[in-house]
């Protein structure tokens, strides 16, 4: 997908593009990523441990334990590699009144979401390597898990892991002041 294809037909007649970019697609460790990868590696280790123990006890009857190792490794690998893979297919655009996020993940199709930038929009810089500009949030409701109601969770939305985040933050502040 070319960068401009995602934006075709989305802009108002008098709306102008002031910035376009794409996030860094490298691996960015987060607490949830480390925790989920740890759970996956635990299952992989326990499956392999059971497999080797069954071989030493009574012969090759523990091959069914390989499935636990496989699922554990897949679970860990997914949580480490998937976020960077998804960012590789993400594009950002800032106009004089809206922020757009487009994703064109293979086999999933193109999705484009816009967020208005008004004087009431809370915009913040999230430090990192590279930093992110957060400008919206979304409440996600989680189902009950293990008889515990986990309640709603707030998910931050923005231009994640962009090298020129400080410049984009300044552009967004200018939009809020009406000077874009």
What are these regions (language model features)?
Residues 98, 102-143:
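Acidic, Ser/Thr-rich low-complexity segments on the non-lumenal side of membrane proteins
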Residues 19, 75-116:
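Conserved beta-hairpin
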Residues 11, 15-18, 110-111, 116-125, ...:
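Membrane-proximal intrinsically disordered regions of secretory-pathway and membrane-system proteins
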Residues 15-17, 90, 131:
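A generic secondary-structure signal marking the coil-to-beta-strand transition
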Residues 127-180:
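A membrane-cytosol interface segment of integral membrane proteins
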Residues 26-91:
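Alpha-helical transmembrane spans
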Residues 1-21:
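Short, charged cytosolic
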